């Protein structure tokens, strides 16, 4: 069975040596306390999650696929996908770069991009589920009315809605 090995050193090279991310983040008031150790710790945990949770579901998920129950109009996802999403939510990953005003962690978006790079590499089919939700979050956060933000963003941030 193929194994996913997250490219942590490559990501650390880009973040630290190429972009100087920790120094750049210090110039941004909301991220001034984020240092290289914090960036590395989040990358390591994201890599561990990607390798241990969605990656093992990649081949079995492709083989099984989704199925529509025509009687109930419900879609059944491959075995393990629902549990993997529950672990994603439990780990706080939906909230990683989301606004703390809506329950997010407020970490830099660059970390969210690294997370999604690893998730897509580990299991692109599974990653569509949280990825679409994060896109909806970003759209509403940028363009939603105050009422839409109040209604939708906390549920998307927590992972309750996907």
Label the predicted regions:
Residues 1-127, 147, 151, 155:
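Amphipathic, small/basic residue-rich leader segments at the start of a protein or domain
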Residues 134:
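His/Asp/Glu-enriched, well-ordered alpha-helical/loop segment
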